[in-house]
Amino acid sequence: MQRSKGYIIIILILLGNLSKGQFYNGSQVDFGKNRVQFNDYLWSHYKYEQFNIYFYEEGKNIADYLARSAHLQLSSLETQFEYKLKRKIQFVIYNTQNQSRESNIGNYPNENSNTGGFARISGNKVFVYFDGNHKNFDKQIRSGVAKVLVNEIIYGDELSDEIKNGAIINFPSWFKDGLISYLSEKLSTETE
């Protein structure tokens, strides 16, 4: 009798642990979010003193436009901050927003949201797409340049500086996001 009670207790404990499988949360795990790339692209690049531009196939005209705009935006923001950018900015251009969503680079948890004209940033890499509107494209470029510049001013230009200053300097995200938004758009009734 004692032995059968012991077996029953062991079986109940094991069955209790197995029943937790019904609360599996694997579909909400953040790893493994690969995106399907529908086409193979032939990438090219331009190298400039302060930035590099990576583009593909029919994006040559867009890359030329980005080069002119980035020079203007960067010099304007450097003058405004009285600070010269030390690291090169890496611009990656996609011809459409759908093509930018095919990329695994800069894969963020809130990937289903619309970027709304703001550039995605990963380190000093700025990912932009052209939606046919030069005003939106300029806004993405200025936003990307502003974010890279602000991050370099606050955290430094070397990885060791970023780690050291990231532990010491802790600005709230709303401050940095607000500053970058202010720098990337002129004040108007729409932005207020």
Briefly describe each language-model feature range.
Residues 1-27:
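Bacterial Sec-dependent N-terminal signal peptides
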Residues 21-172:
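Juxtacatalytic substrate-recognition/specificity segment
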Residues 182-192:
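Short helix/loop segments within enzyme catalytic domains
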